[in-house]
């Protein structure tokens, strides 16, 4: 018997039991490292309540938060990717597709829905970054064109949320063709005078940034989103110079006039609805469901800065 056991009366010792906390209840902010309650983070649309860092959001979660709850219809869900080239690098392309579909629970890297935004008819496309880095390939291009065609048929606006590493190398030239294909489709929107708003989220790179992501009548970015063609590391290695702080981030781009505005995610739904109301002569929506943190910088304070 140890000396401590001799001192303490065993009847006063209460055995402790290890707490059993289910997995996935807590998560950590990628920016500030703060441990966060996942349910609270989801209520805040993936925005850290401590530092306002905008974490990556799945395509369906983004669409569900953006559109009205009623009357949403998914478009192009029957389109599935095929390994036409029988491509293989370190792994077969068809095996990569199966793995990506299991990981993301999506058939490909874009989800398209039509519905309403504050009662206004609208078509919305959103990239799924969890599917092979949101890379643009044949199905992504086909679904985006389907979104454009639906907007033309309904005579309504189109909004696209981009989150992509660029063109998918496993589809080679066919993936590069989607840059021209999507750009040509958007030209029809412009001919009809229908608004197209592009929302650039972290990251929007490569062939996506060089085509549909930067062709909006208004180009909006989320705070601190990485936006560009080649990545900063590649550029530094090429030009052999140190890049300025914040290079290719949305705050840097708005200073250079490359984008039109920066909008926080909780305010995105109301802001886009207000802009579309002005562009389409619809009545402006009420802002009852806008969530604005008192300790976060507002859009007006960003402008003043």
UniProtKB/Swiss-Prot annotation:
Where in or outside the cell?
Cytoplasm
A molecular-function term among this protein's GO annotations: zinc ion binding
Q: Which UniProt keywords apply?
A: ATP-binding, Cytoplasm, Fatty acid biosynthesis, Fatty acid metabolism, Lipid biosynthesis, Lipid metabolism, Metal-binding, Nucleotide-binding, Transferase, Zinc, Zinc-finger
Named cofactor requirement(s):
Zn(2+)
Please tell me where Zn(2+) binds in this chain.
Answer: 29, 32, 48, 51
Q: What does the record give as the function of this protein?
A: Component of the acetyl coenzyme A carboxylase (ACC) complex. Biotin carboxylase (BC) catalyzes the carboxylation of biotin on its carrier protein (BCCP) and then the CO(2) group is transferred by the transcarboxylase to acetyl-CoA to form malonyl-CoA.
Protein name listed in UniProt:
Acetyl-coenzyme A carboxylase carboxyl transferase subunit beta
What's the source species for this entry?
Pectobacterium atrosepticum (strain SCRI 1043 / ATCC BAA-672) (Erwinia carotovora subsp. atroseptica)
């Amino acid at each position: 018997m140890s000396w401590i056991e001799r001192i303490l009366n065993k009847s006063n010792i209460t055995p402790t039991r290890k707490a059993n906390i289910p997995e996935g209840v807590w998560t950590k902010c990628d920016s500030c490292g703060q441990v966060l309650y996942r349910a609270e983070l989801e209520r805040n649309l993936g925005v850290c309540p401590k530092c306002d860092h905008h974490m990556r959001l799945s395509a369906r979660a983004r669409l569900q938060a953006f559109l009205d709850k009623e009357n949403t219809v998914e478009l192009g869900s029957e389109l599935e990717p095929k390994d036409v080239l029988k491509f293989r690098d370190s792994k077969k392309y068809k095996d990569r597709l199966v793995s990506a579909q299991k990981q993301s629970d999506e058939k490909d890297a874009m989800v398209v829905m039509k519905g309403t935004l504050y009662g206004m008819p609208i078509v919305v496309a959103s990239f799924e970054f969890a599917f092979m880095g949101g890379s643009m390939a044949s199905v992504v291009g086909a679904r985006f064109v389907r979104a454009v065609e639906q907007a033309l048929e309904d005579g309504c606006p189109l909004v696209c949320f981009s989150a992509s590493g660029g063109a998918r190398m496993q589809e080679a030239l066919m993936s590069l063709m989607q840059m021209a294909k999507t750009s040509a489709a958007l030209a029809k929107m412009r001919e009809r005078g229908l608004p197209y708003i592009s929302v650039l989220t972290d990251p929007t790179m490569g062939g996506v940034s060089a085509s549909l992501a930067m062709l909006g009548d208004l180009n909006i970015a989320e705070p601190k989103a990485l936006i560009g063609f080649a990545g900063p590391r590649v550029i530094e290695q090429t030009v052999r110079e140190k890049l300025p702080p914040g290079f290719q981030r949305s705050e840097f781009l708005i200073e250079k006039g490359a984008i039109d505005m920066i909008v926080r995610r909780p305010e995105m739904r109301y802001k886009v609805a207000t802009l579309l109301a002005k562009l389409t002569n619809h009545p402006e929506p009420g802002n009852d469901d806008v969530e604005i943190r008192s300790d976060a910088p507002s859009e007006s304070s960003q402008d003043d800065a």
